[in-house]
């Protein structure tokens, strides 16, 4: 009798009910540009210097020294739009997802049920995984509310052996050595 090896994974309600995303395109808004313009007519012929400069650069003036992009819009749709041209070519991605603290902000609800939050994060991290080079890294800022669930989700997508570390950073100096309670003034960067 042969058994299929099992792997450790995080499960939650709705995990496998992910919407199918169709390919997207990015459209530049000159009002929001920072001086370098992508030529919309050369779609598919560009490659960011982040990815090694393999394709022709459509940056006006031939400046290929710009290695970053700022994309305004829904992050899942933006990631999907990048997937076609940049799969396997991004060296470093940094995301700052909602911490799921229970607060309401102008642009998003930060008090989601854990399963809903994980269902929102999973497709984003899966696309980022496809975008990263073999030696690429993903840096995620997060707090205690979801950090440990997020770490396990990343282990599932990237493989546990690809976890580099968790950086703890203190965002407030209110804690003291003689405090009678635990300090809650820190966040994490999961790499």
Feature locations, PLM:
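Structured core elements
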Residues: 70, 94, 139-141, 168, ...
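A short acidic (Asp/Glu
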Residues: 81-82, 149-153, 177-178
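DnaQ-like (DEDDh/DEDDy) 3′-5′ exonuclease domain used for proofreading
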Residues: 1-49, 56-94, 101-115, 120-123
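Conserved Class I SAM-dependent methyltransferase catalytic core
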Residues: 114-168
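Short secondary-structure boundary/capping segments
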Residues: 87, 107-112, 152-158, 181-185
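Polar, glycine-rich mid-to-C-terminal structural blocks
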Residues: 172, 179-191
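A general structural signal for short secondary-structure junctions and capping/turn motifs
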Residues: 2-4, 130, 180-183
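Cysteine-dependent PTP/DSP-like catalytic domain, specifically the C-terminal lobe
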Residues: 165, 170-177
């Amino acid at each position: 009798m042969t058994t299929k090896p099992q792997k450790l994974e995080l499960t939650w309600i709705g995990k496998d009910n992910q919407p199918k995303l169709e390919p997207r395109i990015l459209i530049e808004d000159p009002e929001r540009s920072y001086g370098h313009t992508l030529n919309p007519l050369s779609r598919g012929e560009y490659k960011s210097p982040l990815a090694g400069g393999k394709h022709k650069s459509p940056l006006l003036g031939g400046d290929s020294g710009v290695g970053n992009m700022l994309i305004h819009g829904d992050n899942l749709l933006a990631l999907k739009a990048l997937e076609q041209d940049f799969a396997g070519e991004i060296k470093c991605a940094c995301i700052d997802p909602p911490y799921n603290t229970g607060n309401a902000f102008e642009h998003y609800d930060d008090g989601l049920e854990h399963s809903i939050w994980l269902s929102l994060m999973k497709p984003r991290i899966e696309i980022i995984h496809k975008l990263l080079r073999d030696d690429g890294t993903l840096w995620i800022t997060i707090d205690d509310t979801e950090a440990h669930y997020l770490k396990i989700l990343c282990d599932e997508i990237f493989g546990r052996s690809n976890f580099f570390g968790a950086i703890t950073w203190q965002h407030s100096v209110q804690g003291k050595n003689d405090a009678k309670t635990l300090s809650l003034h820190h966040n994490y960067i999961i790499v």
